């Protein structure tokens, strides 16, 4: 259900945020700090790299905060056999939600059957585990082809469709009201929407939720909750909002 501006304010927006730290050089201490912030602000989920899932499960136990992770981030061109093994591994670790990158090369080549079949196999392997697909809308040039990709993924049974991976590889674009609206107008309601990429202020976050997103992926969760925007965030390696 689409939210209204009256429904979303600084007191409840944390419930829509998957607070993200997937920095390749993130240390254990940095991840522990990240998870403490998840607890303090009661974010919907902590999005962290697979290697930190056991730590996150331990630190967030009993909080109701979900542990989310990813596979084949950005690239999406691992063979499906490898993706299925990675998904099984994440499930064994106890992950609550998984974001995965589809093979955009298949779609852009017109290999639509292969693109859809990959999604169907991932959905089958995931079972009841919420699965989000990082559709790189910025790589698709025409609106009609964007609609085709969205419909294929929903028809395959994917639980969530994202506008992009959020920050990498080149071609991954920031979340926009236009893209979120397009997804909302295309899906039938079987899939839900997660917005990702460049989300750094409260007003931006609220606009994306009002456009149809039900989750936000961002490394700027604290700034958004405080309504401060990205200006207060110190410059760091891998600082692009996810």
Regions found by a protein language model. Give the residues of each.
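Catalytic cores of alpha/beta
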Residues: 57, 78-92, 140-152, 185-195, ...
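Glycine-rich, proline-tolerant flexible connector loops at the mouths of alpha/beta enzymes
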Residues: 35, 39-55, 73, 98-116, ...
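Alpha-helix-loop-beta-strand connector modules within alpha/beta enzyme cores
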Residues: 50, 54-75, 112-139, 155-156, ...
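Alpha/beta catalytic cores of nucleotide-metabolism and tRNA/nucleoside-modifying enzymes
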Residues: 1-33, 178-192, 199-242
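Conserved N-terminal beta1-alpha1 strand-loop-helix module at the mouth
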Residues: 1-92, 152-154
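Structural preference for beta-strand elements that scaffold enzyme active sites
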Residues: 14-16, 45, 64-68, 97-99, ...
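Conserved, mostly hydrophobic/aromatic
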Residues: 18, 56, 90, 133, ...
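Glycine-rich phosphate-binding active-site loops on the catalytic face of alpha/beta enzymes
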Residues: 69-74, 92-107, 155-172, 198-235, ...
């Amino acid at each position: 259900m689409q939210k209204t501006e009256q429904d979303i304010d600084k007191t409840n927006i944390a419930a829509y945020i998957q607070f993200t730290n997937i920095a390749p050089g993130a240390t254990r201490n940095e991840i522990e700090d990240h998870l403490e912030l998840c607890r303090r602000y009661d974010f919907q989920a902590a999005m962290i790299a697979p290697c930190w899932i056991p730590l996150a499960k331990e630190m967030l136990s009993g909080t109701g905060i979900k542990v989310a992770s990813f596979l084949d981030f950005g690239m999406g061109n691992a063979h499906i056999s490898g993706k299925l093994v990675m998904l099984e591994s994440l499930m064994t670790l106890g992950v609550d939600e998984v974001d995965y990158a589809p093979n955009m090369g298949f779609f852009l080549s017109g290999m639509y059957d292969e693109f859809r079949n990959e999604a169907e196999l991932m959905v089958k392997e995931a079972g009841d585990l919420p699965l989000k697909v990082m559709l790189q809308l910025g790589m698709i040039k025409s609106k009609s082809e964007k609609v085709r990709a969205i419909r294929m993924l929903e028809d395959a049974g994917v639980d969530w469709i994202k506008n992009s991976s959020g920050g990498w590889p080149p071609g991954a674009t920031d979340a926009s009201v236009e893209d979120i609206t397009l997804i909302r107008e295309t899906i039938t309601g079987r899939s839900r929407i997660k917005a990702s990429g460049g989300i750094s202020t409260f007003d931006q976050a609220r606009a994306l939720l009002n456009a149809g997103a039900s989750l936000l992926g961002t490394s700027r969760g604290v700034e958004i909750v405080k309504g401060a925007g990205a200006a207060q965030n110190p410059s760091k390696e891998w600082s692009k909002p996810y």
